[in-house]
């Protein structure tokens, strides 16, 4: 039995995946710490594994502190792998782009069924030093409404565009960038984020409102009780996010300015 088996009652499994035979590569990233990258990456990965039990989901932790891998080791099984990516990092802690790219290529070339590769990146991620980003299908950028979060996210997105321009990647072939308003208190918080990114040619995802249960998501307790509470309290959000990752919900065409989903 899956260690998170009870969650499937809330996030029903699906067999109608609409994804590339090469699999899907997802990155949760922002240069700012404390915006919820790891938590969203972990819960989204488990959500995909729960809804699509025939697929392989691999979560790669790019943090030297092993935040994600330590939290999720007790959830790992034959279809949900948690990888500590020490071999994918340089001694400085920066990403080893060559090794990460090799891992992505090998994962995509593996023809053992449907696959999702999820990267959880640490605070301080610099796009101009992270060329492996170009191999991702989706880049989810979590942030809250604070001024520091918004300023850091502006810088992060600007560097992302510099990377695309430097590498000469056509606009329609760039990874899809989706900003995720996270742990917001009111609709006005969401509107503040929307106004601050209105000129960016990216997508604005749904907002996740503040939940105390998120803070307890991965406390060691031997069961999936905390996850069950999270999925119950915010089911629509996780259904939307996993549908987007799986390809069940497709994105509109490349936006000319901020496009709200």
Q: Model-found features: residue ranges?
A:
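P-loop/Walker-type NTP enzyme "switch/lid" segment
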Residues: 20-35, 42, 46-119, 123, ...
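Extreme N-terminal, non-catalytic leader segments
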Residues: 1-29
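Conserved ATPase-coupling elements of RecA-like P-loop NTPase cores
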Residues: 70, 125-132, 150-153
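Beta-strand-loop-alpha "switch" segments that mediate conformational coupling across diverse proteins
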Residues: 183-226
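NTP-binding/hydrolysis catalytic cores, primarily Walker-type P-loop NTPases
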Residues: 221-261
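Conserved C-terminal guanine-recognition region of P-loop GTPase G domains, centered on the G4
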Residues: 153-171, 182
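Inter-motif core of Ras-like GTPase G domains
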Residues: 128-148
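Structural beta-sheet core signal
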Residues: 58-59, 141, 178-181
């Amino acid at each position: 039995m899956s260690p998170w088996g009870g969650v499937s009652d809330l996030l029903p499994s699906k067999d109608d995946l609409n994804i590339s035979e090469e699999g899907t590569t997802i990155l949760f990233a922002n240069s700012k710490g404390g915006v919820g990258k790891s938590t969203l990456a972990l819960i989204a990965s488990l959500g995909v594994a729960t809804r699509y039990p025939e697929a392989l989901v691999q979560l790669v932790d790019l943090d030297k502190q092993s935040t994600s891998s330590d939290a999720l080791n007790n959830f790992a099984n034959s279809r949900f792998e948690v990888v500590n990516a020490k071999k994918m990092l340089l001694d400085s802690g920066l990403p080893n782009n060559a090794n990460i790219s090799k891992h992505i290529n090998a994962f995509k070339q593996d023809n053992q069924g449907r696959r999702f590769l999820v990267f959880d990146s640490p605070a301080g991620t610099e796009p101009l030093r992270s060329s492996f980003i170009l191999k991702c299908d989706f880049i989810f950028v979590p942030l809250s409404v604070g001024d520091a979060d918004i300023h850091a996210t502006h810088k992060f997105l600007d560097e992302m565009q510099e990377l695309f321009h430097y590498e000469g990647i056509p606009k329609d072939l760039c990874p899809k960038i989706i900003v995720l308003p996270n742990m917001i208190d009111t609709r006005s918080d969401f509107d503040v984020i929307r106004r601050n990114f209105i000129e960016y040619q990216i997508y604005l995802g749904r907002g996740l409102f503040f939940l105390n249960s998120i803070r307890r998501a991965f406390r060691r307790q031997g069961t999936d009780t905390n996850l069950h509470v999270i999925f119950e309290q915010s089911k629509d959000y996780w259904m939307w996010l996993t549908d987007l990752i799986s390809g069940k919900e497709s994105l509109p065409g490349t936006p000319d300015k901020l496009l709200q989903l």
